[in-house]
């Protein structure tokens, strides 16, 4: 769960539930997610399914693997215009709600990783769907478009002492007609059970991360971030909580410690 710009009227709120599971051959894996976003009067729902094929590239300490993934998803955008506080209460543009159609999309990515490093590239939505109002039979107008976005990420874990590791990572995001954005993450892993760190998204936000590996199966996390833009001081920051649970079935081993 993520609450952004707490105290700001109409601030974004996001809930996500996801899962992933390797198959018996260990070469194939699948997963899925359900996500809900609310920003002002707009709600969006997304359902996705993922499949991945993994290649073993090494059997040494790193146990390097290369994973190729495909994603299929459907999204729907709804706008509750009647909830908007307007000056002219009789404005016909705000007297109806808009229910968009379900929009299909596909994505792809690749992920190279070992026990202590990773490098990934992805494009979760390759189709540039138009967001069109279909609540009126008299006309349709384009509200926006799902632009194609590319992500690149990389990270590495260095052991400093027996119970202390340093884990930096970077993320770069590129979207058509939008400035290139990215962030840097500096994390420390203590006793393999606790991860604390900070991050900075260029000209956007700065934040702090804390995670606790309660057991081999359960991990809890909390993130606090503050804007470094003109929004600073207008809200109580953004807060995110995370719960991750690994289900062991039969003799399947749980990798521990697992950095990412």
Residue spans for each PLM region:
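Subset of outer-membrane beta-barrel
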Residues: 1-260
């Amino acid at each position: 769960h993520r609450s952004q710009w707490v105290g700001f009227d109409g601030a974004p709120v996001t809930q996500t539930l996801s899962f992933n599971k390797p198959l018996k051959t260990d070469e194939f894996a699948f997963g899925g997610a359900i996500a809900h976003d609310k920003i002002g009067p707009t709600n969006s729902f997304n359902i996705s399914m993922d499949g991945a094929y993994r290649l073993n590239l090494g059997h040494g300490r790193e146990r390097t693997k290369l994973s190729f993934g495909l994603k299929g998803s459907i999204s729907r955008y709804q706008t509750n215009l009647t909830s908007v506080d307007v000056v002219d209460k009789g404005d016909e543009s705000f007297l109806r709600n808009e229910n968009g159609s379900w929009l299909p999309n596909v994505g792809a990515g690749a992920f190279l990783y070992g026990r202590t490093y990773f490098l990934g590239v992805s494009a979760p939505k390759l189709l540039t769907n138009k967001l069109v109002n279909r609540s009126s039979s008299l006309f349709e107008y384009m509200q926006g478009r799902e632009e194609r976005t590319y992500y690149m990420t990389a990270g590495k874990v260095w052991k400093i002492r027996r119970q202390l590791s340093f884990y930096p990572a970077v993320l770069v995001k590129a979207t058509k007609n939008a400035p290139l954005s990215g962030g840097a993450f500096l994390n420390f892993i203590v006793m393999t059970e606790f991860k604390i760190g900070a991050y900075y998204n260029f000209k956007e936000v700065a934040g702090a991360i804390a995670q606790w590996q309660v057991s081999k199966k359960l991990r809890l996390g909390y993130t606090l971030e503050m804007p470094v833009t003109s929004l600073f001081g207008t809200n109580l920051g953004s807060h995110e909580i995370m719960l991750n649970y690994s289900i062991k079935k039969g003799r399947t081993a749980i990798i521990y410690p697992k950095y990412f």
